[in-house]
Amino acid sequence: MAELIIVYFSSKSNNTHRFVQKLGLPAQRIPVDNRPLEVSTHYLLIVPTYAAGGSDAKGAVPKQVIRFLNNPNNRKHCKGVISSGNTNFGDTFALAGPIISQKLQVPLLHQFELLGTATDVKKVQAIFARLKHHTHDKQNKPTT
């Protein structure tokens, strides 16, 4: 099977980290500090949203994630994005996902609130399995 992992960012609050732990999938965390991370395999990106709500989308994508995605090698391996947020912030709920999806031209696969629910965990596990299978099929497709 093709290798596929979760790459995620979680602040010191660890909300996203706790969600990723529930998935039980191979994962790498984008460091909170300025240490670089480079991945050399396909991945799904899980990212929280840092927007204030209303029409203020500034800062929705964490700076660490921007820094990570500024590396062309990291960008090319991203197969999709999943974002979290807080519905109390209205229109900016989980906005980091659509922003990254548009910039990288990858699918926005799911959005969840705060720590996510058991249903969110199952959905993301299913998305991961489907994408891993699809990635495997593409890599093993005979050339004509």
From Swiss-Prot:
Gene Ontology biological process terms from the UniProt entry: protein modification process
Pfam families the UniProt entry points to: Flavodoxin_NdrI (PF07972)
Domain of life: Bacteria
GO molecular function: FMN binding
Gene3D superfamilies: 3.40.50.360
Entries under InterPro entries matching the protein: Flavoprotein-like_sf, RNR_Ib_NrdI_bac, RNR_NrdI
Family classification: Belongs to the NrdI family.
Protein role: Probably involved in ribonucleotide reductase function.
HAMAP family per the UniProt record, alphabetical: NrdI
Protein name: Protein NrdI
Organism whose genome encodes this protein: Streptococcus pyogenes serotype M4 (strain MGAS10750)
The gene coding this protein: nrdI
